[in-house]
Swiss-Prot record:
Function noted in UniProt: RuBisCO catalyzes two reactions: the carboxylation of D-ribulose 1,5-bisphosphate, the primary event in carbon dioxide fixation, as well as the oxidative fragmentation of the pentose substrate in the photorespiration process. Both reactions occur simultaneously and in competition at the same active site.
Organism: Solanum bulbocastanum (Wild potato)
Subunit description: Heterohexadecamer of 8 large chains and 8 small chains; disulfide-linked. The disulfide link is formed within the large subunit homodimers.
Protein known as: Ribulose bisphosphate carboxylase large chain
NCBIfam families xrefs: PRK04208.1 (NF003252)
Modification after translation: The disulfide bond which can form in the large chain dimeric partners within the hexadecamer appears to be associated with oxidative stress and protein turnover.
Gene name tied to this protein: rbcL
N6-carboxylysine: residues bearing it: 201
Location of N6,N6,N6-trimethyllysine modifications: 14
Length: 477
């Protein structure tokens, strides 16, 4: 008889409550290549043993409930249950543990990030036996990876579409983010693209408000980028935010963008949801559109060290759901992002194979097989003085995005774009000549500013702007 249909009436049913660890803590378990593996940071309530806490996480995120039920006898729990197979104490933290849980692949619908998260994090985070819980990392088996389309195009295809090689791409978020009319918004887009940027961007909360309806914005931005393309001879793009209140409205906006002939659209993947994001990613691949992803709302989920979901997990989920770019923090700007942690999930976004490396917060080796890579986007409080560090940290396969660092230039948007393009080209040239960007960065920018008055003006404006705050989420010592 099949284990799925085998009944265990002969064993008998004993009602009542038993400890989770009797069923779900299995330190002898040998993980399988097809298991989804999870690393949880667990903070139990006082008096709850770590083994019971880890087993409770495995149970409540798979087949378990708070009491024994007679229908357990109608299936094979051994086949379907999650298992806490290892627990380790977090050094330097009181009553914190890393609980490793293995989930059999049969628990998850193919090609559905929505279902994966609903199972693994959907209910267990409110469990009373835990003071706090954080999902630190996931190992996605190749058998499951292959059920996802992933990014619509990936890094190499994007470079071929844009005909841009050998340097990071350069972008700008249009400011003020809210309040401009569609025509004035399009004018700002044109000036930035004409000045030398590759992309401009809708801010995450620009959808279709009374001061600027989406269709008007799309039309004026398309006019701006085509005019800038004609003048510069370079392919340009503007991230047209298709995020909407319904999937149907989102798709209507994406279809209109394709009809306009623009190269890229945008989605807020956490507020919009994984189902909507995957739907849009499939449309973008089928219709030749690049897809820029904003991570609005991520810090609500990932910023606290002891509770929530680490961004490296959200980044992996985005690569599965689909996106060609995603915001990843800057390390040097105004937003949260410790260097080693950021570089860890940047590699998880871009590379095909990533080895376990706890020094960068990577708990599991991850093989993405044929899933395309995602370009990390550095954005938030950055300006020309940051250019050497950004070029050194993120390398060529990245998007460096300056909003206020372009539009805040004292001479206007186009000179602001010129300043950033000159700074970028100077840093890339210096790097290619073997110069040390980390040590000589300021000197490289000063040298370039001697023959670029736009860059010299930008250097003067932002020479004293720093964001000296320690990161909240740091690696365990």
């Amino acid at each position: 008889m099949s284990p799925q249909t085998e009944t265990k009436a002969s064993v008998g049913f004993k009602a009542g409550v038993k400890e989770y660890k009797l069923t779900y803590y299995t330190p002898e378990y040998q993980t399988k290549d097809t298991d989804i593996l999870a690393a949880f940071r667990v903070t139990p309530q006082p008096g709850v043993p770590p083994e019971e806490a880890g087993a409770a996480v495995a149970a409540e995120s798979s087949t378990g409930t708070w009491t024994t039920v007679w229908t357990d006898g109608l299936t094979s729990l051994d086949r379907y249950k999650g298992r806490c197979y290892r627990i380790e104490r977090v050094v330097g933290e009181k009553d914190q543990y890393i609980a490793y849980v293995a989930y059999p692949l049969d628990l998850f619908e193919e090609g559905s990030v929505t279902n994966m998260f609903t199972s693994i994090v959907g209910n267990v985070f409110g469990f009373k036996a835990l003071r706090a819980l954080r999902l630190e990392d996931l190992r996605i088996p190749t058998a499951y990876v292959k059920t996802f389309q992933g990014p619509p195009h990936g890094i190499q295809v994007e470079r071929d579409k844009l005909n841009k090689y050998g340097r990071p791409l350069l972008g700008c978020t249009i400011k003020p983010k809210l309040g401009l009319s569609a025509k004035n918004y399009g004018r700002a887009v044109y000036e930035c693209l004409r000045g030398g940027l590759d992309f401009t961007k809708d801010d995450e909360n620009v959808n279709s408000q009374p001061f600027m309806r989406w269709r008007d914005r799309f039309l004026f931005c398309a006019e701006a980028l085509f005019k800038a393309q004609t003048e510069t001879g370079e392919i340009k793009g503007h991230y047209l935010n298709a995020t909407a209140g319904t999937c149907e409205e989102m798709m209507k906006r994406a279809v209109f963008a394709r009809e306009l002939g623009v190269p890229i659209v945008m989605h807020d993947y956490l507020t919009g949801g994984f189902t909507a994001n995957t739907t849009l990613a499939h449309y973008c691949r089928d219709n030749g559109l690049l897809l820029h992803i904003h991570r609005a709302m991520h810090a609500v989920i990932d910023r606290q060290k002891n509770h929530g979901i680490h961004f490296r997990v959200l980044a992996k989920a985005l690569r599965m759901s689909g996106g060609d770019h995603i915001h990843s923090g800057t390390v040097v700007g105004k937003l949260e992002g410790e260097r080693d942690i950021t570089l860890g999930f940047v590699d998880l976004l871009r590379d095909d194979f990533i080895e376990q490396d706890r020094s960068r917060g990577i708990y599991f080796t991850q093989d993405w097989v044929s899933l395309p890579g995602v370009l990390p986007v550095a954005s938030g409080g950055i300006h020309v003085w940051h250019m050497p560090a950004l070029t050194e940290i993120f390398g060529d396969d990245s998007v460096l995005q300056f909003g206020g660092g372009t539009l805040g230039h004292p001479w206007g948007n186009a000179p602001g774009a010129v300043a950033n393009r000159v700074a970028l080209e100077a840093c890339v040239k210096a790097r290619n000549e073997g110069r040390d960007l980390a040590r000589e960065g300021n000197e490289i920018i000063r040298e370039a500013s001697k023959w670029s008055p736009e860059l010299a003006a930008a250097c003067e404006v932002w020479k004293e702007i720093v964001f000296n705050f320690a990161a909240v989420d740091v690696l365990d010592k």
